[in-house]
């Protein structure tokens, strides 16, 4: 078991084209494992006590001087607080710049979706998946933000064009998030918007939830960047009296 995990309390598996949401408490971990290879997990984060506070991709990248997400990086809100830290990572690169797939992306690449014909194997897109989950909390399209795409790597050509790296995630690769404040998590397993596979992906992702070990003073994420130390200070101030 990981040094960051105290106990595993819940496990589930999601196939491609699925979506899910839940409130995750501070001190909880979420480990996501790509069971089949080349998974994509789109994620958004909100403060359940103030839904106006949400994940901010530009600030997350800017304050940590990076274009990618990996071990040591923290996922910031637009209030300068840390939703979660990436405490373990098998891949070394996760995307948070390319955005989300939409119905037109899916149709152009793999044809129209048809629930009547395909049933639960229909070709769902990330945008509509997020809208379904947002609606459960009184939110809508206006509340969407730039999302994380776990397990996906972006390559940039000399001309500045973005492309999805092929065969980036292998079966069994995982990433471990430790939540530093109560967080409303929205996620989907729909294809990355730059996915050019011949067929709609049919992979599977395992998600484990449980109690994380307490944060030590020499915590890797806390000390990864000076900015992260200040982010943890913002969280400490926010949690006074709780």
PLM features: what roles do these ranges have?
Residues 1-242:
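Acidic, Ser/Thr/Pro
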């Amino acid at each position: 078991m990981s040094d960051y995990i105290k106990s595993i309390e819940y496990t589930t598996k999601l196939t491609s084209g699925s979506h899910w949401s839940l409130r995750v408490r501070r001190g909880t971990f979420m480990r996501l494992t790509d069971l089949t290879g080349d998974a994509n997990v789109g994620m958004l984060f909100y403060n359940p006590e103030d839904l106006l506070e949400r994940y901010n991709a530009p600030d997350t990248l800017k304050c940590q001087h990076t274009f990618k997400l990996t071990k040591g990086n923290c996922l910031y809100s637009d209030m300068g607080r840390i939703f979660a830290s990436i405490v373990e990572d098998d891949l070394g690169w996760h995307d948070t710049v390319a955005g989300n797939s939409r119905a037109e992306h899916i149709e152009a690449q793999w044809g129209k979706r048809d629930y009547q014909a395909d049933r639960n194997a229909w070709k769902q897109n990330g945008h509509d998946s997020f809208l379904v989950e947002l609606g459960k909390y009184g939110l809508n399209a206006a509340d969407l933000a730039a999302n994380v795409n776990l397990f996906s790597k972006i390559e940039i050509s000399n001309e500045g064009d973005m492309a999805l790296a092929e065969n980036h995630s292998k079966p069994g690769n995982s990433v471990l998030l430790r939540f530093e404040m109560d967080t409303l998590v929205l996620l989907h397993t729909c294809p990355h918007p730059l996915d050019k596979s011949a067929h709609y992906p049919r992979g599977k992702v395992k998600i484990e939830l449980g109690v994380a070990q307490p944060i030590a003073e020499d915590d890797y994420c806390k000390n990864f960047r000076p900015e992260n130390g200040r982010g943890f200070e913002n969280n400490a101030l926010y949690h006074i009296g709780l």
